[in-house]
Regions:
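N-terminal Rossmann-like dinucleotide-binding module
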Residues: 1-50
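Beta-loop-alpha module in the N-terminal Rossmann-like domain of NAD(P)-dependent dehydrogenases
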Residues: 45, 50-111
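Extended amphipathic secondary-structure runs
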Residues: 87, 136-137, 143-146, 151, ...
Length: 215
C-alpha cells in the first residue's frame, strides 16, 4: 500500500503530544516528509525527534512539493493556509478551530469543492483511548436512563506537565506581532468590538472547549 506523504505545519504542543507521535506509530500508512514552524529550532527539533527528513519555517514552502496531504495545527488563523493547501490540490487535515466566521467556512467549503480533495476537521478526541473506553462501557449498559457530562477546564499546565514538550524562544518579534494582529483581526471580523469578557468567552469556546460545541 502506498503511504500518504504528509507535511505538518505547527510543531507546538498538540503536534508533539498527539499528531507527530501518532503518525510515527502509523508509519506503514503515513510518511511525514516535512515539518514546518515559525520557530526554526522547533521545526528542527521536531524533525530530529520524529525522523522527518526536512523542516521549513514557512508553510508556503509546502505547496509546491509532492505531498499528498497537509496537517495544519499552527496558531490561528489558519484560513489562508487551508485555502492555499486545497488550491494546491492537496488533502487537508485542520486542527480546531477551523476558522472564526461563516464567511471563512464558506470560503473553505468552496475551495474544497473546487479542489475535489478531502478536508477534515481535527477531532482527534474521537479516537482518544479514554473516550473509546467510555464508549465501550456505555455499550455494556443494558438501558441508559440518564447521562451527565461535566467539562472541567483547569490550567493546561497540569495536563501538559506529563509530556516532554519542547518550547523555543527564537521566533522574531515581528512574526509574533503579525500573528497576534492577524488573530485579533479575524476575531474582530467574527464578533466585532466586544468587551474583554466576551472576547475571553469566545476564545475559550473556539479553543479548548470546542470539543463540546456543535452547530
Amino acid at each position: 500500500m502506498k503511504r500518504v506523504r504528509i507535511g505538518v505545519v505547527g510543531c507546538g504542543a498538540i503536534a508533539q503530544v498527539h499528531h507527530l507521535p501518532n503518525l510515527a506509530a502509523l508509519d506503514e500508512q503515513f510518511d511525514v516528509a516535512v515539518v514546518c514552524d515559525v520557530s526554526p529550532r522547533a521545526a528542527a527539533d521536531a524533525a530530529r525527534r520524529f525522523h522527518v527528513p526536512r523542516h521549513v519555517t514557512d508553510w508556503r514552502d509546502l505547496l509546491d512539493t509532492d505531498l499528498d496531504a497537509v496537517l495544519l495545527c499552527h496558531t490561528d488563523p489558519k484560513t489562508e493556509a487551508a485555502i492555499a493547501v486545497l488550491q494546491a490540490g492537496k488533502h487537508l487535515f485542520i486542527e480546531k478551530p477551523l476558522c472564526f466566521s461563516l464567511d471563512e467556512i464558506d470560503a473553505l467549503i468552496a475551495a474544497q469543492a473546487a479542489a475535489g480533495t478531502v478536508a477534515q476537521a481535527g477531532y482527534m478526541k474521537v479516537y482518544d483511548p479514554a473516550f473509546e473506553l467510555a464508549q465501550r462501557a456505555v455499550r455494556d449498559i443494558d438501558r441508559v436512563r440518564f447521562v451527565q457530562v461535566n467539562h472541567l477546564h483547569p490550567d493546561n499546565a497540569l495536563h501538559l506537565r506529563q509530556f516532554d514538550i519542547r518550547r523555543f524562544d527564537d521566533v522574531s518579534v515581528q512574526v509574533v506581532e503579525r500573528t497576534r494582529a492577524e488573530r485579533s483581526a479575524a476575531v474582530r471580523r467574527a464578533i466585532g468590538d466586544v468587551s474583554p469578557m466576551v472576547q475571553r468567552t469566545f476564545n475559550l469556546l473556539s479553543g479548548s472547549a470546542i470539543h463540546d460545541l456543535y452547530g
